[in-house]
Amino acid sequence: MDYKPEPELHSESSERLFSFGVIADIQYADLEDGYNFQGNRRRYYRHSLLHLQGAIEHWNQERSPPRCVLQLGDIIDGYNAQYKASEKSLERVMNTFQMLRVPVHHTWGNHEFYNFSRDYLTNSKLNTKFLEDQIAHHPETVPSEDYYAYHFVPFPKFRFILLDAYDMSVLGVDQSSPKYQQCLKILREHNPNTELNSPQGLREPQFVQFNGGFSPEQLNWLNAVLTFSDRNQEKVVIVSHLPIYPEASDSVCLAWNYRDALAVIWSHKCVVCFFAGHTHDGGYSEDPYGVHHVNIEGVIETAPDSQAFGTVHVYPDKMMLEGRGRVPHRIMNYRKE
C-alpha cells in the first residue's frame, strides 16, 4: 500500500524530542477470517500477525527509532481458548514481537482474560512492569500488586502511565473470590440483562461483562503520580485498553467508572494524551481540559491490503500521530499554560 506523508506532519516548527509506536487489538488466532459478534464486521484472524510484522519492520527501519511501542491490549483473540490454543498463539505473537528492537509495553484487555487468569498474566511475558520507573522518596507513586499498572519515563520530563482497566472486572478472577462477587454485584446493579455482555436497554451501556473499571485504590495511586508530575512539570501520557471519554468512543466500549478516571485526570494539568484500544473503529476527541483522547483502530478488523498502527512524534509544544493505513494522522497541541 502506497503511503504519502501529509505535508503538515513534516513541516516541523520545533525540534522533535522522541517518538513512540502504538498498536491495538491484534487479536491473533490461527483461524479463517470471521466476523464480529453482530456479524457485520470482518475479522482477519491470521492476517493480524502479518500486520504486526509489517508494523515492526517499519519501526525497526525508522531513521530515528521509537523509544518504545505501546501495545494497547487484546493481543490474541478469545477464540483461542475455545480451541485450547491460547499459549501457542501467545507464543507466536510474542516471538514476532521479539523482532522489535525497542521495548514494548503491554496493556491487558478483555481478550487476555478470555484466554488466561490474572495470575497467569502476572507471571507471563505480557507483564512488562519490570520496565517501570521508581521515584525515589515517593512511596505513594509505587503501584500495588493488586492491579497491573505502572509508570515509566521514555524521555526526560515525559511520564507514561499504564492503567489496568480490568482491575474491577468479572474476567480473569476466581469466581469464589470476594473480588469477583463484589464486581459481579456492581455489574448486576447496572445491568439486569440475563446476558451480561448485552447493553440492551441500559442507561449506562458501558456496564457489560466485556468491560471493566478502575478500583479506588488504583485511582488514588494515579492521583499520586499525577501530583508528582504536576510538581515536577512533567507531561503525561496515559495508556489503557478501555477508553474513558464518551466523545471519543462508542458508549458501549467505555470503562465502567470512566467518570471517576476523568475526575482524577481533570484535577491535574500534566496530562496531554490518553491512548486506548478496544473500539476497533478508532476515535478521537480533545476534552475541555485540553487532554487528547485517541482510540487506535484495531488490527483485527483491518483488511490485508491496509494497515493499522501509528508512530507518535513528540515535540516541545505538541504530539503528532503519523498513522498508517486505517489510523489517521493527528496533530495534538498541548494546552497553553
From Swiss-Prot:
Cofactors demanded by this protein: Mg(2+)
Gene3D superfamilies: 3.60.21.10
InterPro entries: Calcineurin-like_PHP_ApaH, Metallo-depent_PP-like, MPP_ADPRM
Superkingdom, taxonomy of origin: Eukaryota
Family from the record: Belongs to the ADPRibase-Mn family.
Assembly behavior: Monomer.
Family annotation (PANTHER family): MANGANESE-DEPENDENT ADP-RIBOSE_CDP-ALCOHOL DIPHOSPHATASE, PTHR16509
Protein name per UniProt: Manganese-dependent ADP-ribose/CDP-alcohol diphosphatase
Organism: Bos taurus
